[in-house]
Amino acid sequence: MGQKVHPNGMRLGIIKSWNSIWFASKKEFSNYLDSDFKVRSYVKKKLIKASVSKVIIERLSKNIRVTIYTARPGIVIGKKGEDVEKLRIEIAKITGVPAQVNISEIRKPELDAKLVADNISSQLERRVMFRRAIKRSVQNAMRQGAKGIKIEVSGRLGGVEIARREWYREGRVPLHTLRANIEYNTSEAHTTYGIIGVKVWIFKGEILDGMLVVSNKKDKKPFISVKKVSQKYRK
């Protein structure tokens, strides 16, 4: 039975970067990892209504820089920047080093896999029909310029006794193409019947910058080996 590799982990170092950017020795590695987990858990719990997509953590020599990607930056910043200052102080307490918090706005939340998954799960918790929620999210993503999108929900859909899995796809989602910019994320809907899992794949296009170019030493010209299939037609 075929299994699917994680689309983000497969493309790390090729077209995608890490969410935690730092280097640590063997002694400090576990402490840094635990600290990052606590910071992300606190941010997502504190900003549950701010539509937070991801949290990037960078550790410099003696301080930490946290970048929060959100579709509602006004909720994160607060009145005259009071909320973001409280957030910075709390993160500094968790990590034990001076913290810097940056806010990055997501212009098109319809093309962010995490926000799409959270939107569908919130609709399922409000007892919206799952097919209607999926089709609405697919139409919004394609309207905003997505090349393809796939959404999968699994669990006791519609309150039935036997759990099942359903998915809907529009456009193309090339999972094996490394240069394909595919966003993948998940979410959970806590309903009265149980937990319903939501998975979202969004294909935004291909990234060709930074790809490996093979060069011929004799000709000193870069080339890409492509097999041309010649077809002969008989009259």
Curated annotation (Swiss-Prot):
The lineage of its organism: Bacteria, Pseudomonadati, Pseudomonadota, Gammaproteobacteria, Enterobacterales. Keywords: Ribonucleoprotein, Ribosomal protein, RNA-binding, rRNA-binding. This is Small ribosomal subunit protein uS3. It comes from Buchnera aphidicola subsp. Cinara cedri (strain Cc). One of its GO terms (biological process) is translation. Binds the lower part of the 30S subunit head. Binds mRNA in the 70S ribosome, positioning it for translation. Gene3D superfamilies: 3.30.300.20, Ribosomal protein S3, C-terminal domain. GO terms for molecular function: mRNA binding; rRNA binding; structural constituent of ribosome. GO terms for cellular component: cytosolic small ribosomal subunit. Residues 39-107 form the KH type-2 domain. HAMAP family: Ribosomal_uS3_B (MF_01309_B). Belongs to the universal ribosomal protein uS3 family. Part of the 30S ribosomal subunit. Forms a tight complex with proteins S10 and S14.
